[in-house]
């Protein structure tokens, strides 16, 4: 009986550690995915003002003739 309890306790302990490691890995993946989305938004924010500035300088030259 004592060895059975010991075995079950060991299995429970190892299962808990395994579950904890899987959850940490999942959280790390979600953070990486979230980080990519934020980077894409920042690139868009930097790109549009540049595009508007370029169009603002080109349009008067094109239609000014």
Curated annotation (Swiss-Prot):
One GO cellular-component annotation of the UniProt record comes to:
extracellular region
Q: In which tissues is it expressed?
A: Expressed by the skin glands.
InterPro entries according to UniProt: Frog_antimicrobial_propeptide (IPR004275)
Q: Which keywords, in A-to-Z order, does the entry hold?
A: Amidation, Amphibian defense peptide, Antibiotic, Antimicrobial, Cleavage on pair of basic residues, Cytolysis, Hemolysis, Secreted, Signal
Where does the UniProt entry say this protein principally localizes? secreted
> Which residues lie in the propeptide?
23-44
**Keyword Phosphoprotein part of the UniProt annotation:** no
Q: Which GO terms describe its biological process?
A: defense response to Gram-positive bacterium; hemolysis in another organism
Q: Where in the cell is it found?
A: Secreted
- Mark the residues carrying the PTM Lysine amide: 65
Can you tell which superkingdom this protein's organism belongs to?
Eukaryota
Q: Which residues form the signal peptide?
A: 1-22
Q: What does this protein do?
A: Antimicrobial peptide. Active against a variety of Gram-positive bacterial strains. Not active against Gram-negative bacteria and against fungi. Shows hemolytic activity against human erythrocytes.
Q: Which family does it belong to?
A: Belongs to the frog skin active peptide (FSAP) family. Temporin subfamily.
Instruction: State the protein's name.
Output: Temporin-SN1
């Amino acid at each position: 009986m004592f060895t059975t309890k010991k075995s079950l306790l060991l299995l429970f302990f190892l299962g808990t550690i395994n579950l904890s490691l899987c959850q940490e890995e999942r959280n790390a993946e979600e953070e990486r995915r979230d980080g990519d989305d934020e980077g894409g938004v920042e690139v868009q924010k930097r790109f549009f003002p540049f595009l508007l500035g370029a169009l603002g300088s080109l349009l008067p030259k094109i239609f000014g003739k």
